[in-house]
Amino acid sequence: MAAAAVLAAVPAPAHAARPHQSQDQGNGTTVVVSLSLSKYTAVKAIDAGSTVGVKPDVIRVHVGDSVVFVNDDTDHHTATSLLNAATFVDDPRWTDDALRPNGEIGPGFWSTGDLSPGQRSAPLIARKPGTYLFGCFFDYGAGMRGEIVVEP
């Protein structure tokens, strides 16, 4: 079973700093990301635009690492990729595919699927270096967005 660092409890040094993580038994580390509009209410500015409700808002991982999203809120959330976006777009034009777990972190479509309150996503493996933006299917308009930076 993979060990995971819960990042909500780790003070964020720099907004894009790679946090301390435990080595898992797979190919890399597992990073846990918290989704909650009620806990993380401060709007933050990152390179891609403004974000709220995601801790940390910028996640740094390496190829082979995995990211697990946890819904720490009382409402449903997703973490769903924004295809080919360098900044947060006004309308991501997602379909209901965002409500089903799909894909791996990389240039293609990926999503945690619909996460109920308290639910953890399946691990999403980072497969290709790059910067990947994501948002919540339900609360994108409220600013629930983030960025994953995958390093070699």
Regions picked out by a protein language model, each given a short descriptive name:
Residues 2-9:
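Bacterial N-terminal signal peptides
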Residues 11-152:
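Extracytoplasmic copper-binding redox domains, predominantly the cupredoxin/blue-copper superfamily
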